[in-house]
Amino acid sequence: MSTTDELLKNAQAYAASFDKGELPLPPARKVAVVACMDARLNPYGLLGLREGDAHVIRNAGAVITEDEIRSLAISQRLLGT
């Protein structure tokens, strides 16, 4: 099985058993995090966060660019972080 096929299979299984739909859209901890996209790092585990706790925005080097500013502005202005 190719990596793509495996990822698609896992995504289908995740979607079929997804039980987080009742969580509100604004994050429970009212925080947004910008983190590096380094695949070795788990920002949720690092910060002790669970699904629904925070908006996590990832990019190369955790650099704040115009894209991150836009995402942070939406997170803060519309969703209360």
Labelled PLM ranges:
Residues 43-44:
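A short, structured beta-strand/loop element
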Residues 11, 33, 57:
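Divalent metal-coordination and catalytic microenvironments
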